[in-house]
Amino acid sequence: MEKRRVVITGLGVVSPLGNKVSDMWQALLAGKSGVKPITRFDASSFPTQIAAEVRDFDPALVLDLKSIRKTDVFVQFAMESARQAWEDSGLEINETNAPRVGVAIGSGIGGMPWIEKNYDALLTSGPRKISPFFIPGAIINMASGMVSIKYDLKGPNISIVTACTTGLHNIGHAARMIAHNDADAMIAGGTEMASTPLGIGGFAAVRALSTRNDEPEKASRPWDKGRDGFVLGEGAACVVVEELEHAKKRNATIYAEIIGFGMSGDAYHMTRPDPEAEGFTTCMKNSLRDAGIAPERVDYINAHGTSTPAADPLEARAIKKTFGDHAYKLAVSSTKSMTGHMLGAAGALETVISVLAIRDNTAPPTINLENPDEGCDLDFVPNEAREMKIDTVMSNSFGFGGTNGTLVLSRVFD
């Protein structure tokens, strides 16, 4: 059976740079940072006191008060980004098509605030004070579950959990389900809210986070010699992915086509990437093979680019191994320099960003890149957005446990 073509017809975000797609995109193009001192708790005793928090979020936009009390924030973020994507797509559900439309939304960690809140209740007041909604409100697949319930989606209902690759993997697998005729459309993405005492403390304990507390907006600086770790972000992003002819029949706005999806595993270490960058390289090559295109077709890469000392130069090395001489003709940027690392939501948000780069023929910048590190000699679109012809974009996500994912997105040509 010939694979069906899959396109993106709806976008939605909740992010440190704004809770609408247009607000987030304009902030990115302006090179604004969403990193600020932590406000969710008193972080004065923590080595890291900064994060890229979501601000001015109102869960009542998408949930009633009763549902808000039953769910963790990561579910609420997912619900709002899914609402935006759904409304943007213009899809309508009826008894006939409901079994052909599904959901794939994951989270790297899940209900961290909900877990902390109920554990505190257990310690201070005993087991009877644990919420009856603790388990259903905290489990990762409840993001997909609540979205499917709200929109009566009776197709595939899954939540892939792969650390920092979660969002991209959910979108990639949703596209494959459509390509192989398991669904006609899916809401897919990722969500995260881990900027809590345990979340910040846990990442600080493995020395993954920046401690540039006196200059929050300059803390996330991918490929720069002065980088000292990533900045934790939070939020959610969803896209509606849909079979091409299905989208055309209802005159949907088609943003881009998903033409390639690659995966690989490092098989090296729990938290450190393979020092030869073989996993990263294999993943990118697999995505190009799946897309059936030459490396020279790619115009822009939205890189994983976390601002960690170990991973940044390895991703640059993998790009060179994948693209050869063309690597130096590519525009490559890390929008985590502005959004922070949104963990399970990162790959989903960066898919949205990649789509907008194609739509507007503009590569967002890598901010805070002042002194590129050794081996980091590609065109990283330093500090200012760039208008350029963009027809094909590659987006990378790599995660703890050596789990890697790459999407290739293209302008739709008929």
Swiss-Prot record:
CDD domains reported in the protein's UniProt record: KAS_I_II (cd00834)
Highest rank taxon of the organism: Bacteria
InterPro entries (UniProt xref): 3-oxoacyl-ACP_synth-2 (IPR017568), Beta-ketoacyl_synthase (IPR000794), Ketoacyl_synth_AS (IPR018201), Ketoacyl_synth_C (IPR014031), Ketoacyl_synth_N (IPR014030), PKS_Beta-ketoAc_synthase_dom (IPR020841), Thiolase-like (IPR016039)
EC identifiers of the protein: 2.3.1.179
Pathway(s): Lipid metabolism; fatty acid biosynthesis
Gene3D superfamilies referenced in this protein's UniProt entry, alphabetically: 3.40.47.10
A GO cellular component entry from the record: cytosol
SUPFAM superfamilies given in the database record: Thiolase-like (SSF53901)
Active site feature: C164 (for beta-ketoacyl synthase activity), H304 (for beta-ketoacyl synthase activity), H341 (for beta-ketoacyl synthase activity)
Keywords: Acyltransferase, Fatty acid biosynthesis, Fatty acid metabolism, Lipid biosynthesis, Lipid metabolism, Transferase
Stretches assigned to the Ketosynthase family 3 (KS3) domain: 3-411
A GO BP entry: fatty acid biosynthetic process
Function: Involved in the type II fatty acid elongation cycle. Catalyzes the elongation of a wide range of acyl-ACP by the addition of two carbons from malonyl-ACP to an acyl acceptor. Can efficiently catalyze the conversion of palmitoleoyl-ACP (cis-hexadec-9-enoyl-ACP) to cis-vaccenoyl-ACP (cis-octadec-11-enoyl-ACP), an essential step in the thermal regulation of fatty acid composition.
Subunit organization: Homodimer.
Stated name of the protein: 3-oxoacyl-[acyl-carrier-protein] synthase 2
Species whose genome carries this gene: Coxiella burnetii (strain RSA 493 / Nine Mile phase I)
Taxonomy of the source species: Bacteria, Pseudomonadati, Pseudomonadota, Gammaproteobacteria, Legionellales
